[in-house]
Amino acid sequence: MIRCPDRPRMSADVGRYGYPIVWPDEVGETGAVGDLGKPPPVSRRFGDAVLFARSMHAGQARKGTQIPYISHLLAVTALAIEDAATDDLLRDQTEAIAIAAMLHDVVEDTRATVVDVAGRFGDEVARIVAACSDTTGSMPGEEKPPWSCRKQAYIDHLAEADQATLCVSLADKRHNARCIVEDAAAALLAGGDFWSRFNAGPDQQAWYYDELARVFSVRRPGPAADELCGTVARLRELATLTRHQ
């Protein structure tokens, strides 16, 4: 079904590809025909967040690729929305979680600050974004702490984090782990160098994701954490194969 809100009724009630159009006055109180309940709202603020992320991350690409960085932000946002919207405790926070997921790297990887995010999207979004970063305590231009120190501090932080932060962070780590596994497997088959694109080698990456999977399994158990555990098991195998290559 195609829904067309805020448009006047027209004589043609069939969409471009032959699907029937459902007008707002024909949709029941549940917000959709035959669904299980009204979905959590996602307002124009989310669209503003997409535009802001696109602007701030313009010209950035995923490590070692020519894939626009916003692809990662969109993937993480989709995973976070699905997780939040199916969680009774987080459903009412779905929009804030979606916006925070879209902006989860904006403070760490662009010139934007937590104050900027709060001014545009509110304190709750800014709080989640700050909590998902491992470098928000650094001053502009200040050198980051060593990789292992940052990652251990982040793992310790997740052990105490709230569920909204865990939802966004888990979505981020799920997508990152998937991409690492896919690219590492392809590089292993092709005999190419993959791990050099990171600040830490395969063994350190395997340790980090093992620890993340352990924390998420305890703090946010469920299908999303289970998926991460499975992906991390494969990542660990690839790290071992790389070491013996």
Q: Which stretches of residues belong to each language-model region?
A:
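Active-site helical microenvironments for divalent-metal-assisted chemistry
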Residues: 3-4, 11-245
